[in-house]
Amino acid sequence: MNDWTIEDARAGYNVTHWSQGFYGIGEAGEVTVSPDPLNPSNKVALDTLAQDLVQAGIALPVLVRFPQILHHRVESLCDAFNQAIQKYEYQNDYLLVYPIKVNQQKTVVEEILASQVSKEVPQLGLEAGSKPELMAVLAMAQKASSVIVCNGYKDKEYVRLALIGEKLGHKVYIVLEKMSELKMVLEEARELGVTPRLGLRTRLAFQGKGKWQASGGEKSKFGLSAAQVLKVVDELKEANMLESLQLLHFHLGSQIANIRDIRQGVSEAGRFYCELRQLGASINCFDVGGGLAVDYDGTRSQSNNSMNYGLTEYANNIVNVLTDLCNEYEQPMPRIISESGRHLTAHHAVLITDVIGTEAYMPENIQAPAEDAPQLLHNMWQSWTEISGRHDQRAIIEIYHDSQSDIAEAHSLFAVGQLSLMDRAWAEQTNLRVCHEVKGLLSNNNRYHRPVIDELNEKLADKLFVNFSLFQSLPDAWGIDQVFPVLPLTCLDKAPERRAVMLDITCDSDGIVDQYVDGQGIETTLPVPAWDPANPYLIGFFMVGAYQEILGDMHNLFGDTNSAVVFVEDNGKARIESTLDGDTVADVLRYVNLDADEFMHTYEELVEQHIVEDERASILEELQLGLKGYTYLEDF
């Protein structure tokens, strides 16, 4: 593969498509970040940035945030809707509401809000789904439009806090998720002397396709049926409060890959809106919820990890459907609201870490078995000589299948004591040699060979032991088989001579990344440059900005990683705005109610009992440093 080029690397890892222009591969084979896709020359190499962070005392793994990407995502989504509104002569506006559940980190929320600071009329609000989230947005929403959407199940305290938000100058929409909430809201509103802004979440009959499709449809956890919606209208009429009903909300589910699903859902919900208006409801906001997908694998397809549409098509479909429906029913066009958290945050964060070790299969020379060796070993030797000598007429794949059958029999014979350990080791090495040889003779252009190639890629893949916890940093990769782009940050100017799998440092066999973006598809192994300990490369896990931090758990007590907020200046230099230390060992012990100070007293007692006096001080110092240390590996 001497003709390998950077374009081959870009295509092989499909960077151009999943990155949306925010990340790329430079001519020297380095992965770069460019927060403004319209100015691609303004970029920074991630490996260089990682070195700068390490020199500043920030150990790997480190989660790097690029706020400029957040700004760009907000602007691009608002622009898409603004252009669609102009195109279809829609008689209202658009508001982007950020659901903070996607990423509640202070920096993330503040930077999303900061993207609208210069706007005369901000197009940004916040959504809360719990009391803690509501308390946060009550203190932050005034930095944008002061619009707050309250979703989720509610108790009296939640409702009162939302109503107090109105007294604080916010425009708070309390979305009714179940019938019992209506009475509670009206009672608390009367007590506080507040006119509530009510919303309805309706259950659509239509259900979008995807991993989160249970969020929509008639059996959804949230929302009101058609009959319940009408009952709410009747009760509001009786209370002379129908004018308080101002928002209609529905949700098809997160990561809707097919634009037709979105169009169909908007069409059904749009008829709810128009008919409720005909019944006298004063609804003036149409909240399409989430669903705007992110193209994790870059295939622009209907797969669960992709999307078959872009921002322009998304906005055009929603605006077009609502325009036609409102004209058909002769009803005013409502303000369009979307809750597009994944779209805003996914790209902005990258986890950068190091490889702590590797395990690779390298072919070894093997000798013919002794004449008195079990017949099985002679059969395996025959397969090896036939495939290596290229003089057998049998199909390559047939020989491969024979070898797999033989190695399975060898393991069975060893288990019942009919094959020695030395014989088993010889059989395994011979089988690996056959596999290695077969792989070199197969062709991707032959469709009959492809399943075997995939099998061999997995069987012969190198293992890269990577300094991170899958459960902490990529929980969706483990929990729902979400695909995240991953690739080495340097050495991509060299042809990928090996294929590998990434394993984390937890004591759990599930701690393995088992799906990788590879060209225009998903594979179980990743093509990588050959590992050179003298010139190691770092690993980057991309598009981890949505949900991963807040969903991450502390399996094996691996805690939050270090993090950094980085801006790329106009001169192409990285400016490290701020850093935040990850969890120490003492921190994670406290999470599970273990007292580090108490442990230290115990260590002192044990040292007093078991360690000679000259060593006590140094031993205690190491134990104390251990409690203060990073939960991830630092010296290896």
Swiss-Prot record:
Cofactor section: Mg(2+); pyridoxal 5'-phosphate
Originating organism: Shewanella denitrificans (strain OS217 / ATCC BAA-1090 / DSM 15013)
Enzyme Commission number: 4.1.1.19
InterPro entries: Ala_racemase/Decarboxylase_C, Arg_decarb_HB, Arg_decarbox_C, Arg_decrbxlase, De-COase2_N, Orn/DAP/Arg_de-COase, PLP-binding_barrel
SUPFAM superfamilies reported in the protein's UniProt record: PLP-binding barrel
Coiled-coil portions: none
Name of this chain's protein: Biosynthetic arginine decarboxylase
Family according to the record: Belongs to the Orn/Lys/Arg decarboxylase class-II family. SpeA subfamily.
Gene Ontology MF annotations: arginine decarboxylase activity; metal ion binding
HAMAP family, sorted: SpeA (MF_01417)
Gene: speA
Catalytic activity: L-arginine + H(+) = agmatine + CO2
N6-(pyridoxal phosphate)lysine carried by residues: K101
Transmembrane segments: none
Pathway per the UniProt entry: Amine and polyamine biosynthesis; agmatine biosynthesis; agmatine from L-arginine: step 1/1
UniProt cross-references to Pfam families, sorted A to Z: Arg_decarb_HB (PF17810), Arg_decarbox_C (PF17944), Orn_Arg_deC_N (PF02784)
Function (record text): Catalyzes the biosynthesis of agmatine from arginine.
Chain sites annotated for binding substrate: F286, D287, V288, G289, G290, G291, L292, A293, V294, D295, Y296
GO biological processes: arginine catabolic process; putrescine biosynthetic process from arginine; spermidine biosynthetic process
Keyword flag Transport: no
Keywords: Decarboxylase, Lyase, Magnesium, Metal-binding, Polyamine biosynthesis, Pyridoxal phosphate, Spermidine biosynthesis
Enzyme kind, highest EC tier: lyase
Lineage of producing organism: Bacteria, Pseudomonadati, Pseudomonadota, Gammaproteobacteria, Alteromonadales
